[in-house]
Amino acid sequence: MPMQIMLSTQVADEAWGKNALLSFHQAQATIHVTDYSARNTVQKAARKLRGQGIKDVVLAGENWDLETCWAFYQGFYSAKQDYAVEFPTLDDAPQAELLARIQCGDFVREMINLPAEVITPVELARRAAHFIEEQAEEYGDKSAVSFNIISGEELKAQNYQGIWNVGRGSANPPAMLQLDFNPTGNPDAPVLACLVGKGITFDSGGYSIKPSDNMSTMRTDMGGAALLTGSLGLAIARGLTQRVKLYLCCAENLVSSNAFKLGDIITYSNGVTAEILNTDAEGRLVLADGLIEADKQQPKMIIDCATLTGAAKMAVGNDYHSVLSMDDALVAALFKSAETEQEPFWRLPFAELHRSQISTAFADIANTGTVPVGAGASTATAFLSYFVKNYQQHWLHIDCSATYRKTASDLWAVGATGIGVQTLANLLLNPVKG
């Protein structure tokens, strides 16, 4: 029998402790909040209920709305998906929004949580394309979606040198998804946004190999690709009417006799050469191919997402996504969307000086910072800037360290979070004017 969960602004009886978050009566639990908009309080209560082994619940009573239902679901979710939540009947619009958030958020979490033996580079590209097709079919027209998956040696033949070099050491071939969501029906319609995601389905570090503890969660290094796919899916569910292109740059970074090595120099299709000083700085190498392709489309904005640097995670932990850009108006639009959706983002510095901190005697740029004390997240962004012609405008880089938690918190279970899906969907629907 499922437990009924009530929501109340009344203070719990002191028998449950001072300012108790939860109280119980037979097969009913009550969450005590100061007001009905207290999302974090509801999410914490859901985590506590899960911690007590409760897996089957009904949200009962008249005080539940879209945001409290969503907060409860966020806290109740677990990677094992061994739970059931029955929601109250909401009005049509919030009910549809709740289901869309669950659908898109669960896609992101599942992709990140699944093992690398399941989510190979080609499989990640395939599942992402299939998901966007399903969203387009459910909320509009499946014919709005077209895509191409380039894999293996064909990447080399088409000069996607970053993805091919990073992925050539694995038996699972690297892949690039090129997806076009065009609901206008006009093949010449302008592109609102190009989304470029890092899809490293497992990262050993390559010859700059990671220690075992750091490697244990590296199936999640495709979090940026999953996040952007889920965001586009939610934007479609919310009624996106403008053209958006999605590029996922997918590979496994492994050690083998065929793997790329330190000292190698990659020549990209835009003519930029990059020396490999650290094979564990591979994410920027694959993203470069996607950014070159995105830039060719002349979109109004380019957004890339990647679990790119440990430096960003050291700065903001698992609690925020880091934002780096020289376009203040675009950053402001992102933060407005984040405020609306109540998701955590934090801006880190990116300036011209960082572009001079990745120099090398053997190529145009190096794939790591080459100054004694460098800002790792900033120099990684600087590397990417060499693949966006007008990098000072209309380009936003997100170092998304909040995609996954290795340990639980009072808000989140171990595993993928889905943080950022709503914000980026909101930004696609509310872009910078002009």
From Swiss-Prot:
Binding site for Mn(2+) 1: 203, 280, 282
Cytoplasm is among the record's keywords: yes
Keyword ATP-binding appears in the UniProt entry: no
UniProt-listed GO biological process terms: proteolysis
Sorted UniProt keywords: Aminopeptidase, Cytoplasm, Hydrolase, Manganese, Metal-binding, Protease
Residues annotated as the enzyme's active site: 210, 284
Cellular component, GO annotation: cytoplasm
Cofactor, how bound (note): Binds 2 manganese ions per subunit.
Subcellular location: Cytoplasm
Catalytic activity reported: Release of an N-terminal amino acid, Xaa, from a peptide or arylamide. Xaa is preferably Glu or Asp but may be other amino acids, including Leu, Met, His, Cys and Gln
EC numbers on record: 3.4.11.23
Amino-acid positions noted as binding Mn(2+) 2 in the UniProt annotation, renumbered to this chain: 198, 203, 221, 282
Chief location of this protein within or outside the cell: cytoplasm
GO MF terms, alphabetically ordered: manganese ion binding; metalloaminopeptidase activity
Needed cofactors: Mn(2+)
NCBIfam families reported in the protein's UniProt record: PRK05015.1
Oligomeric and partner information: Homohexamer.
Family, similarity comment: Belongs to the peptidase M17 family.
Job description of the protein: Probably plays an important role in intracellular peptide degradation.
Full protein name: Peptidase B
Native source species: Pasteurella multocida (strain Pm70)
Gene giving rise to this polypeptide: pepB
